[in-house]
């Protein structure tokens, strides 16, 4: 029977084969006509790659069927070069965890009375729980940037 083999260039080769011929035999016939080694050939029929050990009848290849010949590609993707950094990586800032940090804001005297060590911000957007930083001559809120200046007798 006669089958056709279409190459990548669009050229069609005609081969005389039998249904009992193996795919290896077909590849050998293509090598005789085109000079392409069988290990570089891949034959495709009905969207499937044909395996060397099987016959044409296994794939239901009949007379005047068309096989597509593509070349086997060796290797994979291009190997990427490892990046080499010229400056060392910046160390990420780690927040220090202070156990019972609330104890820094209040003081308990011997009578059991609680005294606030820091002043809470009075700004509208701040509210309770936002303490102001103590400077030499003022209190400063880091959130709303309000400042309360001491008078000499206020300290």
From Swiss-Prot:
Site feature Essential for function, where: 68
Any single GO CC term annotated in Swiss-Prot or TrEMBL for this entry: ribonucleoprotein complex
Gene3D superfamilies, per database record: 6.20.50.150, Phosphatidylinositol 3-kinase Catalytic Subunit, Chain A, domain 1
Pfam short name (any one): ubiquitin
GO function term, MF aspect, one: zinc ion binding
Listed InterPro entries: Ribosomal_eS31, Ribosomal_eS31_euk-type_sf, Ribosomal_zn-bd, Ubiquitin-like_dom, Ubiquitin-like_domsf, Ubiquitin_CS, Ubiquitin_dom, Ubiquitin_ubiquitin-like
Cross-link Glycyl lysine isopeptide (Lys-Gly) (interchain with G-Cter in ubiquitin): residue positions: 48
Domain Ubiquitin-like positions: 1-76
Cross-linked residues, Glycyl lysine isopeptide (Gly-Lys) (interchain with K-? in acceptor proteins): 76
UniProt keyword list: Cytoplasm, Isopeptide bond, Metal-binding, Nucleus, Ribonucleoprotein, Ribosomal protein, Ubl conjugation, Zinc, Zinc-finger
CDD domains for this protein: Ubl_ubiquitin (cd01803)
Site positions (Interacts with activating enzyme): 54, 72
GO biological process, one term: translation
Keyword Ribosomal protein belongs to the record: yes
Start and end residues, zinc fingers (C4-type): 121-144
PANTHER family given in the database record: UBIQUITIN
Family label: In the N-terminal section; belongs to the ubiquitin family. In the C-terminal section; belongs to the eukaryotic ribosomal protein eS31 family.
Name of protein: Ubiquitin-ribosomal protein eS31 fusion protein
UniProt organism field: Manduca sexta (Tobacco hawkmoth)
Species lineage: Eukaryota, Metazoa, Ecdysozoa, Arthropoda, Hexapoda
